[in-house]
Amino acid sequence: MNHTHETIIAGRPMKVEFGKLGMLSDAAILMSYGDTVILTNVNASEKPREGIDFFPLSVEYEERLYSVGKIPGGFIKREGKPSEKAILNGRAIDRPLRPLFPKGYRNDVQVVCTVVSVENDNLPEILAINAASMALCLSSIPFTTPVAAVQVGLIGEEFILNPTSKEREESSLQLTVCATKERVMMIEAGGDEIPEDTMINAIKFGFDKCQDIIKFQEEAVSMFGKEKKVPELHKVPEEIEEAVREFAFDMISESMHITDRDERNAAMDEVKAKINEEFEEKYPDNMSDIGEAVYDMQKEVVRHMLLKEGKRPDGRAFDQVRNIGCEVGLLPRTHGTGLFTRGLTQVMTVATLGSISEIQILDGIGEEESKRYMHHYNFPAYSVGEVRPLRGPGRREIGHGALAERALEPLIPSEAEFPYTIRLVSEVLSSNGSTSQASVCGSTLALLDAGVPIKRPAAGIAMGLITSKDLTEEEVLTDIQGLEDFFGDMDFKVAGTEEGITSIQVDTKIKGLSEKVIHDAIYGARKARLMILDKIKECIPAPREEVSKYAPKTSTLQIDPEKIRDVIGAGGKVINKIIADTGVKIDIKEDGLVYVSSAESEGVKEAVKIIEGLTKEVKAGEIYLGKVTKIAQFGAFVEVLPNKEGLVHISKLDNKRVEKVEDVVSVGDEILVKVTEIDSQGRINLSRKDAIKEAEEENKQQ
């Protein structure tokens, strides 16, 4: 049976259809917003997965190119692995949903959001979060708290709900807010240096607008939602919990109070070894339960330390940033390098400058077709002192790379100001919390070292949160380290400049964040950011005046778009000859902007000269240095510009009478000539006599 429900959000219809498609899924819905449509299927395993200590939720965001009327490129002509954007969108759906499942729920759950139709005014990634929540709420899976998502734009001083494509172009803010009825669950933002108070008001605006979508979901559930199954929730047996607590709590507490990281880890390893020795014979089938009991006690000790004792594991004040180190120019042959160290977290970012032709071409369902600035993030096992096979980037690495990329995007100079493709690679050398924000700082250092004229330096910091079980007590922490991230309740990453915020990413392990926590985290991040920016400026106060001598040399020139065909030539003959003769790369835009780049500046100069010659118009009255190409009885033919030839009649060759042309010039000679006339057929008449006369007059005046 097909059920439908509809509402209006920001003047556009939002609709859900349930029961028509995917009959064998626990719940399958078709959810639309305008002409953007997402098919969402959710399913859960019948039984919990044995031997695990986590909730096995997987979220897939599947892009279908037919949704935008495209056929995939390449030989195979079908969608391949998910695009980076699809991976990021999948992560964004996962983060607000995961904390709202019951604690101890270990059934495998899969949420698949398939994008089947896209209208550019209505972003599929925002609709997908709402669709995932709606499908889970309508299903028999024990998920009962609706989550809503909206995008907030800012044009002038006005907040825009779910901005259209045109409004997004004008907006200085791209903010996604996910919320339940009571609290904010997730924040993603990119902005053009947005002031803190404006960002807080934008989040409040988004939270309020989420309530209409939550009401819409609740109405749908009351009308045609399935009855919820009673979940089989995993809980550590009371007997085991009490036994482990009695044996190990004091040892765990003592170990967790050690401020030095290595000593603390060594002490905890000893405690765990003693626990295993004590209980492995008595409870051989419950070692994962024992591990969970130890984790819960560690978390309890850390919470007590922070909330009741007012101490952090490493002895810092709640608003204190770890020691900062900044260095540039480490690698001799790269175009720019930045090394950023914060405590035991260390990231080296390397900048590479390339020609405009080296932009990344995107083949996806989004409006963006190419990227000129990109940031990649690598997190090898050695950064945490572990041994693992080296593989390609995972979802986390793609997410962290995109976050640091977004933080600096508003500060990158335009193509006209800086005609280079820019690639940054952040290598995490040591990780003890907040490597993504260390990558922002390392990227700033590398860009400045590479001579990229960024608008202003940027820095990032991660704020954390510790709460009591009933959420009545809350403490916001500045610059969380690994332990505080692991046992904490929030990861609130903020990057920006002295002027304002350029990116935010927030996720939580609890059922949402209060208004006070968001306010304190944003303003606490500003205080820390300004301190880090001072350290960056001490290291390198401004971009280097010139790019590295190893970077490609680039020049731009504007030509008449009508002349593009002259530069390219029939079948690319002319442009290919220029490239072959000078060793340059040439990129020509439709508006006639030409980019010429090469490792050698001489090649660039030569190519620019040729292109200028090909596109420059010969003007009557102008004097040119031309080359004699051919001699006839009646005069000499002279090339004044590439492929532009004129005739110097024998009577115009010299001030005195000339009997034979060869008496004055030979083929290959370079001579000054003046354009006396361009006739109706485009023929160019030249005079050497007039050019000599003008030159003599100029000499007399000097």
Swiss-Prot record:
Nucleotidyltransferase recorded as keyword: yes
UniProt-annotated binding residues for Mg(2+): D485, D491
Enzyme class: transferase
EC numbers, comma separated: 2.7.7.8
Reaction(s) this enzyme catalyzes, per UniProt: RNA(n+1) + phosphate = RNA(n) + a ribonucleoside 5'-diphosphate
GO CC aspect terms: cytosol
Top-rank taxon: Bacteria
Record GO terms (molecular function): 3'-5'-RNA exonuclease activity; magnesium ion binding; polyribonucleotide nucleotidyltransferase activity; RNA binding
Domain KH, chain residue ranges per copy: 552-611
Cellular location(s): Cytoplasm
Cell inner membrane as UniProt keyword: no
Main subcellular location: cytoplasm
Function: Involved in mRNA degradation. Catalyzes the phosphorolysis of single-stranded polyribonucleotides processively in the 3'- to 5'-direction.
Family in the record: Belongs to the polyribonucleotide nucleotidyltransferase family.
Protein name, entry field: Polyribonucleotide nucleotidyltransferase
